[in-house]
Amino acid sequence: SLQFRRWLSVIDYLQVNPALGGWAEFQQLNAQFETMADLVINHCSAESEWFKNFCAGKSPGAGYFLEVGEDFDTSAVVRPRSSPLLRTVETSNGTQNLWCTFSHDQVDLNFANPEVLCEAVRILKFLISKKIKYFRLDAIAFLWKRSGTPCVHLKETHELVKLLRLILE
């Protein structure tokens, strides 16, 4: 549903959805139960600061999203949506076609950029510091993209999951 998609369209990775309270309320809950969080690192919201900064050519955000050129072969891509794969946006660097696995309000991050990986690790470490013990890796199978492939369950994605597990251990 649209509401569920919005739930997974992260605007700020370090904040609790205000409709659910804040970190103080979370800590009260966490004192009574072991908690699990969705780690949504495949994509983030087109309303996020990262995306706004990407469009303006500023950091953090510049280079964070997957720009798809004409030479990228998407013919074998497998995804659970029938909406257009690419979203055209105007940026300070001109018109860009960005990868959107699920919807145009959820823009895929570019894990070929080491800064994006560092951000994902920083987010995970922050959530661990909040005593979250378990994580569901939302849409993780779609994390890495390689021209001419289905862009799902690629080796690079599995390597990244191994890295996340090492951090958790």
Regions found by a protein language model. Give the residues of each.
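Acidic/aromatic-lined carbohydrate-recognition and catalytic surfaces
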Residues: 1-121, 125, 129, 140-169
